[in-house]
Amino acid sequence: MRAPTTARCSGCIQRVRWRGFLPLVLAVLMGTSHAQRDSIGRYEPASRDANRLWHPVGSHPAAAAAKVYSLFREPDAPVPGLSPSEWNQPAQGNPGWLAEAEARRPPRTQQLRRVQPPVQTRRSHPRGQQQIAARAAPSVARLETPQRPAAARRGRLTGRNVCGGQCCPGWTTSNSTNHCIKPVCQPPCQNRGSCSRPQVCICRSGFRGARCEEVIPEEEFDPQNARPVPRRSVERAPGPHRSSEARGSLVTRIQPLVPPPSPPPSRRLSQPWPLQQHSGPSRTVRRYPATGANGQLMSNALPSGLELRDSSPQAAHVNHLSPPWGLNLTEKIKKIKVVFTPTICKQTCARGRCANSCEKGDTTTLYSQGGHGHDPKSGFRIYFCQIPCLNGGRCIGRDECWCPANSTGKFCHLPVPQPDREPAGRGSRHRTLLEGPLKQSTFTLPLSNQLASVNPSLVKVQIHHPPEASVQIHQVARVRGELDPVLEDNSVETRASHRPHGNLGHSPWASNSIPARAGEAPRPPPVLSRHYGLLGQCYLSTVNGQCANPLGSLTSQEDCCGSVGTFWGVTSCAPCPPRQEGPAFPVIENGQLECPQGYKRLNLSHCQDINECLTLGLCKDSECVNTRGSYLCTCRPGLMLDPSRSRCVSDKAVSMQQGLCYRSLGSGTCTLPLVHRITKQICCCSRVGKAWGSTCEQCPLPGTEAFREICPAGHGYTYSSSDIRLSMRKAEEEELASPLREQTEQSTAPPPGQAERQPLRAATATWIEAETLPDKGDSRAVQITTSAPHLPARVPGDATGRPAPSLPGQGIPESPAEEQVIPSSDVLVTHSPPDFDPCFAGASNICGPGTCVSLPNGYRCVCSPGYQLHPSQDYCTDDNECMRNPCEGRGRCVNSVGSYSCLCYPGYTLVTLGDTQECQDIDECEQPGVCSGGRCSNTEGSYHCECDRGYIMVRKGHCQDINECRHPGTCPDGRCVNSPGSYTCLACEEGYVGQSGSCVDVNECLTPGICTHGRCINMEGSFRCSCEPGYEVTPDKKGCRDVDECASRASCPTGLCLNTEGSFTCSACQSGYWVNEDGTACEDLDECAFPGVCPTGVCTNTVGSFSCKDCDQGYRPNPLGNRCEDVDECEGPQSSCRGGECKNTEGSYQCLCHQGFQLVNGTMCEDVNECVGEEHCAPHGECLNSLGSFFCLCAPGFASAEGGTRCQDVDECAATDPCPGGHCVNTEGSFSCLCETASFQPSPDSGECLDIDECEDREDPVCGAWRCENSPGSYRCILDCQPGFYVAPNGDCIDIDECANDTVCGNHGFCDNTDGSFRCLCDQGFETSPSGWECVDVNECELMMAVCGDALCENVEGSFLCLCASDLEEYDAEEGHCRPRVAGAQRIPEVRTEDQAPSLIRMECYSEHNGGPPCSQILGQNSTQAECCCTQGARWGKACAPCPSEDSVEFSQLCPSGQGYIPVEGAWTFGQTMYTDADECVLFGPALCQNGRCSNIVPGYICLCNPGYHYDASSRKCQDHNECQDLACENGECVNQEGSFHCLCNPPLTLDLSGQRCVNTTSSTEDFPDHDIHMDICWKKVTNDVCSQPLRGHHTTYTECCCQDGEAWSQQCALCPPRSSEVYAQLCNVARIEAERGAGIHFRPGYEYGPGLDDLPENLYGPDGAPFYNYLGPEDTAPEPPFSNPASQPGDNTPVLEPPLQPSELQPHYLASHSEPPASFEGLQAEECGILNGCENGRCVRVREGYTCDCFEGFQLDAPTLACVDVNECEDLNGPARLCAHGHCENTEGSYRCHCSPGYVAEPGPPHCAAKE
């Protein structure tokens, strides 16, 4: 630690120490990243957050601004006198620094204003006589005291430095106290010096002068005499860091060990030593990205002299490592885990083109224990270093550094005093390391994440690997213990090439150093973006205003916007900063460095290449190769880049081979070729071609791999080979040469004997150094230098021939030793001092693109192929091969870095011979088709044609055939045909004649007698004949011949045809035809015109015949239909003589009647009514006629006898005892009872003995005050209790505790038991119902008028809400009206976050799955814990935590209203959460009631299953009902199906119309039972098994009688089935209405309700006898009555309702309702609705005017009452057309039902009935 800055007194030194300590402590407490420094080094809050850190409780920010402490920090030097452990300690109990802090507090009256710091003027350097332009610092805000006397501001002062009540001259009051303890220096101290005493400045290190205005020149360290050698002084312009993430370091360069002689100032070369030594008390505050708990960047600090400078001259950055005292952070680390992936790249060259192919290996994990680890299988070795090795040192063990020759110490941080002081053994260790078979890559990475640590745990990892591999590190983590490996890792993407000296690659922790030129001031740090250091998403383009095409990895804003990106962002995308026309090279203008596209600022003077290949997604299907300022996508052999340069396509996609394209392909044959030859990709990618080429190659189908190979862009698009090849050639020339050559060098083994001197590679980073732009009017040239891994650029000399000064980073030491040039063009030998290895100690690429070979007296450069030594003979430069004319005038030579290429002229082709290229002549004469019709002679770059006879030379140099036929007279008597080189005369064809060398047509029609029986038509070269009717053209079409019409059957089809010349005749017509008048056809004969045809019918003529129809009665047409024959009426089962015997006659029949029948009209037997005229059944019966007979209907007390023809008395006393309690006496037609005791009396109606009820009301009760209970023949007296009491076994009346039933009084009150009764004490917002047995909600909106003012009042359960009509307003409870909503204000009252936050989290809700693992069945994906656990859920959340049980405290807290109720989001009243019924159908709709419909009830839900399903409570689904278990198929085999069943019948049985019975269709008796065939009497009433009140007028069938008004049928009095039975429903095709009415729940046919009817309660009636109509959910039970009598016995007269029948017994004999069940509606619950009845049969919705009802289907809104009333569809004239045809309509609640008439069945679809088949 250096000594503090000296001053004139010791006390001042002490104050300086505390003065430096105070602001640092406050900065640590306050956070230096939140502060900005003003022009004199003080800190001010950078935002309102900084002010908030200092605000006292309850103070206003404006008032607190005067309390902000002024901070002072020296970022480049540690605080004197303090250890790093004290930096984070809070300042406590020190009156010295506290008084100093109070002295620095600004007065309350200070004003914040902006001032300009003094502008530093140009001054002459004391040694270099160079002008340095001082830069003015940007304007900053600072606190400045107004110019008023201190006494006027503070009043009278006391204490020291006070003169006359005011501060003495040179002193002023401090900012925080009223004492004159602050010295005044005018003018103020510069360069951040401090004013210690009046007019006395204490300067910072590196500055001197009265006002610290002079920069102390740097000193060189001379190891010969161990004394500092002064260098040119360096000035540093003051300027505060405006970014909260300021980075910076003070870098001092050291000259070589042997100082050269001082040349004249104008000729001196400034060549800094590449290994940097940092001196001076500098400290760099840096920020490392970390993933802390809050996601913020951690602040870390490094001390002086602990910075590692990369040994590469191209890597102009400083790597900051951990300080020595930070080692305690990793002392306990015994094991380090390193995960990396090796990559091996090889270079293949073919046909003059080279390509890179890289193959990644397996991801390797090595553990470093004790400082190093080794994997013998993979050949990799890693070193883990806990100490930093500086000045080019390398870590070779856990706590050991290998130091170069010019440094020493544990960290290589001390310079070597003398050359002979180097410790022994180090050099040998270094040589052993280099001679090994492995190479090393070095990475400096953070080991773990720490919160605000000043000593970051950075580790330096060296990976030794085979030379052909490179390494990519994924993870570096610490392992705390062997048994419990707790990893603390940082994932990184660090790439490094194999460098033997451990140069750091793209380390994301490399800071921006500022290398200082000799004689030039260090430039201020760059102005960093507010996004500096953040990683975000980089976008390549936008689509419809939205960012699109994101890259695959996160990048910084500088890397994104400086390379390929247009938009960038962390949480949202923003356009990249506008980039002006960027320079082609880096320039510095107005103090800012501008980099070209593809580069980013490395520091104030260097631009570093952006490695775009580190960003995923640029080269989609290709390999990415980084180039200078850009990148390149390369492809594997057989592939090439498309025009987008980012995708590899097959070289078949740009094949230039041409062939025929066929538009049709069938049966392997190609047809319809195109005219021109085209390529295969144009043919097959254009949807035109089906096949291509000479072999008829079929085009590949779209979507196949073959199609994508030739059509990578899809249908309608092809690639241009010229574009692709030109771009590839350009890429090879400008971009591929250097990277590929460098990789070739790296993979090439060194020559024999040079293994110990391997070539030194440059760092992978590329940087460009820029000179400062001159001022306007300066005529000096701008000097720009670039440096790259393969080509370090040089600055040429000026016009006067002076050698240009070397630039920093070239790494060429300045040496007075002589140079010896070896006779070679690429070897330079330089003599150096003893013990000086320039190839190692210097930059790794001292020779540039060549190999540096150390010599005893210097070094030599062996240049790579394509390079030559620079004229200065000190490094390799590109060899311009084009100067030697390698293309020999046959093409254009294009030079490239390290190579060249020839662009051959037409007529020449490129030939590559090894490393050379040349253009050779193309022999066009060897190509087919050249000089056709002549002789070809090849020439240089072209060819020449000599034409044969018959050809002529054309302009293009080709031979063209002469067409001799163009000359008239060539062939006077024939036709001339041209041929290649000649012609031929041919004779004219038939029909033509020669004329002037051509053939003309002959008109044959001019010849007489041609075309007899026709007309001649002349044609070109021939003629044809058009014949008359009856003639046809001859085969040669030159004559006409007769047509034989008789050869076709169409002539005379019903007769004989005779052919004649030109015509024909018909004869011998068939029966029914005759010959017409012209004899050419046989016409039909009308037989009906002749008399006597069809005498007993009507004759109808037909073609060729006739038929007899409409025969007379008793006749019918015979099978031939040509006569009417007699009908035998006596044949067949249905004889016309019913009740008699039939006898057939001609045209009629005769009836012979049986007894009981009589003949009517001689044709039928009619029943004789014996009951007319004679009294056969008198006097005790009524005569009823029957078919062929009669029977007697006897009066009560009489029975039929003698076959039913007589009535006789019934002895009632003989059959049963009709007189219980008495004696029976038979009488005529009746009986009488003689009662035995006085407790019975005869009935006046029936005469039976009836019990006398002694307990009936009478004046003198038989039991007095006791309760009388009647019994047969007697009675008993029972002690009775008042209501609310029950009788105990001992006879006492005990009070009934109604409150023992928890359901009494509901959920909104509690029960208070009283004697004989109880009362309900209701909660707030509820009141007792009129019955006093429950608590009902109080409608505050109706009771309290205008309770919400002008807002809408909405009543909720237990309270009310005030809602504003507009969403832009909110209700103010204090003012009582709506006011505009404040921005950001919450509508619901603010409550504690910790109480409300869990209820807002929505996660998965699970149900218990029987037999399966937990959390295997998801109820809902987006449910709160209350919605899940208060309803049907069993587990909730990502952790699948079980829901609390209903009897737990957690459940009562989560679900205070009980099961089925959830809190209403946003609804608060009087500070309490409102709860409402949970609609499980909405929350868990898809998981509930599958194969059915879910219906919400309060509380719970119900499942309405589809037909064929029943509800399963365990799975909450509707399961298939196995109908086959219910004997569904009679006489057949039942097969169950999902939701239905099917009956399989065995032959000859078939399935009837019901689908449930197999019947025999061959037997008529099976199809038509007797009671459906015969007609008989229908009885309307049956009493005591006696049928009475017959239906008079007509007889009916059994079905008609029972389904209309009858109760029995036929003479046997067959009883009809009960109307509530299944037999009646099947017989009459109606639903069991009585069964529906008997149930407490109104069932809809075809659906099952609830958890199954077996689970319904036995008693669906309440205490008042009214049935409960609420539907039962899967977990609910029927509501218990408010109270019950425990002493009630099962035998009491308690109304009991039997469970209704199963739904399977209700189907399927009904016509379903027309309307479907109402769909699920979402609306307000009844308790939330502002309508009195809650919109029953509809849903309640809120509108602007209030509330209204949205009615379900089948209901309509009644406007006056706001109620949904049923629509009577049966009376609606506008309803369905012909509603319930063939049946009658019955209106139901919300729908209607059709009942089909007998003989009709229900049809699917529209509601109507169809006749049975």
UniProtKB/Swiss-Prot annotation:
The keyword Repeat is annotated on this UniProt entry: yes
One Pfam family matching this protein: hEGF
Sequence ranges assigned to domain TB in this UniProt record: 536-588, 659-711, 1403-1455, 1576-1628
Subunit structure: Forms part of the large latent transforming growth factor beta precursor complex; removal is essential for activation of complex. Interacts with SDC4. Interacts (via C-terminal domain) with FBN1 (via N-terminal domain) in a Ca(+2)-dependent manner.
Cellular component per GO, a single term: extracellular region
Glycan-carrying positions: N175, N328, N406, N603, N1161, N1301, N1422, N1560
Binding site for heparin: L329, T330, E331, K332, I333, K334, K335, I336, K337, V338, V339
InterPro entries for the chain: EGF-like_Ca-bd_dom (IPR001881), EGF-like_CS (IPR013032), EGF-like_dom (IPR000742), EGF-type_Asp/Asn_hydroxyl_site (IPR000152), EGF_Ca-bd_CS (IPR018097), Growth_fac_rcpt_cys_sf (IPR009030), NOTCH1_EGF-like (IPR049883), TB_dom (IPR017878)
Expression by tissue: Expressed in the anterior chamber of the eye.
Residue stretches of biased makeup (Pro residues): 257-266
SUPFAM superfamilies linked: EGF/Laminin, Growth factor receptor domain, TB module/8-cys domain
Renumbered residue ranges of the record's region C-terminal domain: 1631-1813
Protein name per Swiss-Prot or TrEMBL: Latent-transforming growth factor beta-binding protein 2
Disulfide-bond pairs as recorded: C185-C195, C189-C201, C203-C212, C385-C395, C389-C401, C403-C412, C538-C560, C547-C573, C561-C576, C613-C624, C619-C633, C635-C648, C661-C683, C670-C696, C684-C699, C685-C711, C839-C852, C847-C861, C863-C876, C882-C893, C887-C902, C904-C919, C925-C936, C931-C945, C947-C959, C965-C976, C971-C985, C988-C999, C1005-C1016, C1011-C1025, C1027-C1040, C1046-C1057, C1052-C1066, C1069-C1082, C1088-C1099, C1094-C1108, C1111-C1124, C1130-C1142, C1137-C1151, C1153-C1165, C1171-C1183, C1177-C1192, C1194-C1207, C1213-C1224, C1219-C1233, C1235-C1249, C1255-C1268, C1263-C1277, C1281-C1293, C1299-C1311, C1305-C1320, C1322-C1335, C1341-C1353, C1348-C1362, C1364-C1378, C1405-C1428, C1415-C1440, C1429-C1443, C1430-C1455, C1481-C1494, C1489-C1503, C1505-C1518, C1524-C1534, C1529-C1543, C1545-C1558, C1578-C1601, C1587-C1613, C1602-C1616, C1603-C1628, C1729-C1740, C1735-C1749, C1751-C1764, C1770-C1785, C1780-C1794, C1796-C1809
The family this protein is said to belong to: Belongs to the LTBP family.
Record region (Heparin-binding): 94-115, 226-243
Biased composition regions of type Polar residues, renumbered to the chain: 108-132, 293-302
Modified residues (Phosphoserine): S491
GO molecular function per UniProt: calcium ion binding; growth factor binding; heparin binding
Chief place where the protein resides: secreted
